């Protein structure tokens, strides 16, 4: 599927509107259409080089929209559901999640890694694979995100 997104192709500089391809969702993932995205100071810190990340990466971790497709194993979300994003793709199994501290989930290690929870990427453009900030990349028309980030 084709989409447009605001991409940081280098470690500093402007976000650039680019044409990308989105893969279908994998297990425990959903394909979403973002209707709204928030601009956060984190995005500005990325742009000016204050926060390290693995470019290229689609910006944005605050957004809302509509679920378009669900991957294998997703049972609590259906196509057509409206959602807002949660910045933490909590696992529900680590010691933090089991004590109600999902904001400290072990999955936090993936937030700026540029990969999905399985270590792969769902966005492609200019012959490269792209990551998404906080596994969300809300500065895109469509993206695949972890089902645990859909509220």
List each model region and its residues.
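Short structural boundary motif marking the start of a folded domain
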Residues: 1-6
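Extracellular beta-rich ligand/substrate-recognition surface
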Residues: 7-14
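Residues that act as N-cap/strand-start positions at coil-to-secondary-structure junctions
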Residues: 14-17, 137
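Short Gly/Pro-enriched turn/cap motifs at secondary-structure boundaries
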Residues: 21-22, 54-60, 130-135, 141-142
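Glycine-rich beta-strand-centered segment in the early N-terminal region that forms part
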Residues: 22-37, 47-98, 103, 111, ...
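Conserved Rossmann-like nucleotide-cofactor binding loop
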Residues: 40
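NAD(P)H dinucleotide-binding glycine-rich loop of Rossmann-like/cofactor-binding domains
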Residues: 93-151
């Amino acid at each position: 599927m084709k989409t447009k997104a605001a991409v940081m192709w280098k470690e500093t500089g402007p976000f650039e509107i680019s044409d990308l391809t989105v893969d279908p969702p994998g297990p425990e993932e959903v394909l979403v259409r973002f209707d709204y995205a928030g601009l956060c100071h984190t995005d500005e810190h990325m742009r000016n080089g204050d926060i390290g990340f693995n470019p290229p990466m689609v910006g944005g971790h605050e957004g809302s929209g509509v679920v378009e497709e669900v991957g294998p194993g997703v049972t609590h979300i259906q196509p057509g559901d409206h959602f807002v994003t949660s910045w933490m793709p909590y696992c529900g199994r680590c010691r933090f999640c089991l004590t109600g501290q999902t904001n400290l989930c072990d999955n936090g290690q993936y937030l700026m890694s540029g990969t999905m929870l399985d270590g792969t990427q769902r966005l492609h453009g200019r012959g490269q694979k792209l990551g998404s900030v906080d596994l969300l990349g809300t500065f895109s028309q469509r993206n695949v995100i972890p089902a645990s980030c859909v509220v």
